[in-house]
C-alpha cells in the first residue's frame, strides 16, 4: 500500500477487496467480484457484512455465496455506522418501488418514509463512520433521472460530494453487456477524494438471443394450454388474464413493424399480454408476476408453442448460472426464485463496472 493526498490509502489492483453489501438480494455484485477473482483480475474479496430483510433472499444469498447468516445485519435503519467494519467498497441497489414507472411514483425524498427513501440510509451511515469506504456504488431504475425526481437525486449527490466523494453516473442497458434482456438501470459511482478516475464500460457487442439461455426438456406446466392460445394460418391467439380464457384473433400481417396488437386496440396493453420471440430480447424482468410477464414463442419440433420462462432461465437472464440457481432452489420455492431474479442487478453489468473500477 502507499499513501495518497489527504492521507488516503490506495488499493493495489491485487489486494483482497473488503466489501459491504446493502439491500443485498441474492448478491449479484458478490457474484461479479468472484468472477473477477476467478479470472485473476483481483486477488479476491472478503465480505464484511450484508444487509437484507427478505427471509427468502437471505436464504438464497447464503446458499449461493456460502456465507453464514450471522454476517447479515438486517434492517438498514437499525444499523449504526460506528458498528461497521471497514470496507473498501459499499454496494447498494436500494428499493425502486417508489421511483419505477411500474410503481406508485411517490419518490425517494429524505424522511418521506417511502421504501425508495431507504437509499438515504446509506448516506446516513457514511456520515456516521470515520474511515469511509473508498468506493460506493448505488443502483436503481433509469427513471430516477427523470424530471420528477431530479431535485431529490441532486440533493442525494450533493450529500455525497460534501462527504468528499467524486461522482460518476450513467444509465446502462443489460442488452449491451451480453445479456439478451432490455433492462436499463442507473448507476452512481462515488470515489472518495477522487483518488482514481473512472469511465463506464463500453458496450460489448454480441448477437446473443434469448434462445441461447433457454433450458432443455421443459416441463409441460410452463406451456400455455391449447384452449388458451394457438397459432393458426398466420394469426396469433392472445389471452388476457381478465378475459376468463376468452381470446382474440389478430391478423399478424398488419403489424409487420412490430409493437402491440389486440382487438380493435381496446385491450389495455400491459407486459402480461405480450409474447416475445426466442430470437430476440427479453423484456425487463421484474419481481412482480415475472413468470406471466415474460412469455416466449418457442419452436418445439417444428410446432410453435407459447410458454412462460422458467425460474432458472430468469436467473440466467440476470447473469447467474445454473449452479447458483440449484443452490437457491434447495432453500426457496419457485415463486420466491422468480421474485429474487426480478429484484436483482444483472451480474454482467456490475461485473464490467467493477472491472473498470478495480482493475484499470
Q: Model-predicted segments: where are they?
A:
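Core alpha/beta nucleotide-donor-binding catalytic domains of modification enzymes
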Residues: 9-133, 142-154, 161
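Conserved S-adenosyl-L-methionine
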Residues: 73-74, 142, 164-176
Amino acid at each position: 500500500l502507499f499513501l495518497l493526498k489527504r492521507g488516503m490509502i490506495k488499493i493495489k489492483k491485487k489486494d483482497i477487496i473488503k466489501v459491504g453489501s446493502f439491500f443485498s438480494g441474492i448478491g449479484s455484485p458478490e457474484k461479479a467480484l468472484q468472477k473477477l477473482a476467478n479470472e485473476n483480475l483481483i486477488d479476491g474479496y472478503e465480505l464484511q457484512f450484508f444487509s437484507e430483510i427478505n427471509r427468502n433472499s437471505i436464504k438464497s444469498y447464503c446458499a449461493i455465496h456460502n456465507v453464514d447468516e450471522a454476517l447479515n445485519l438486517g434492517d438498514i435503519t437499525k444499523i449504526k455506522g460506528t458498528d461497521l467494519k471497514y470496507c473498501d467498497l459499499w454496494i447498494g441497489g436500494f428499493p425502486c418501488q417508489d421511483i419505477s414507472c411500474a410503481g406508485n411514483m411517490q419518490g425517494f425524498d429524505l424522511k418521506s418514509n417511502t421504501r425508495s427513501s431507504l437509499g438515504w440510509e446509506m448516506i446516513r451511515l457514511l456520515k456516521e463512520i470515520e474511515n469511509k469506504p473508498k468506493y460506493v456504488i448505488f443502483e436503481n431504475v433509469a427513471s430516477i433521472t427523470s424530471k420528477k425526481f431530479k431535485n431529490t437525486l441532486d440533493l442525494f449527490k450533493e450529500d455525497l460530494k460534501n462527504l468528499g466523494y467524486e461522482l460518476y453516473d450513467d444509465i446502462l442497458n443489460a442488452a449491451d453487456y451480453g445479456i439478451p434482456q432490455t433492462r436499463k438501470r442507473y448507476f452512481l459511482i462515488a470515489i472518495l477524494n477522487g483518488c482514481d478516475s473512472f469511465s463506464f464500460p463500453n458496450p460489448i457487442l454480441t448477437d446473443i438471443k434469448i434462445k441461447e439461455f433457454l433450458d432443455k426438456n421443459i416441463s409441460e406446466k410452463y406451456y400455455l394450454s391449447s384452449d388458451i392460445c394457438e397459432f393458426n394460418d398466420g394469426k396469433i391467439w392472445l389471452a388476457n388474464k381478465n378475459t376468463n380464457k376468452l381470446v382474440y384473433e389478430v391478423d399478424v400481417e398488419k403489424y409487420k413493424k412490430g409493437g402491440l396488437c389486440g382487438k380493435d386496440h381496446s385491450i389495455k396493453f400491459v407486459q402480461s399480454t405480450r409474447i416475445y420471440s426466442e430470437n430476440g430480447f427479453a423484456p425487463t424482468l421484474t419481481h412482480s408476476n415475472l413468470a406471466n410477464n415474460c412469455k416466449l414463442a418457442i419452436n418445439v419440433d417444428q410446432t410453435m408453442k407459447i410458454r412462460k420462462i422458467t425460474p432458472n432461465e430468469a436467473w440466467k437472464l440476470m447473469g447467474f448460472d445454473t449452479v447458483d440457481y440449484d443452490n437457491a432452489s434447495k432453500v426457496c420455492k419457485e415463486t420466491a426464485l422468480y421474485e429474487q431474479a426480478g429484484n436483482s442487478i444483472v451480474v454482467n453489468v456490475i461485473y464490467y463496472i467493477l472491472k473498470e473500477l478495480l482493475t484499470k
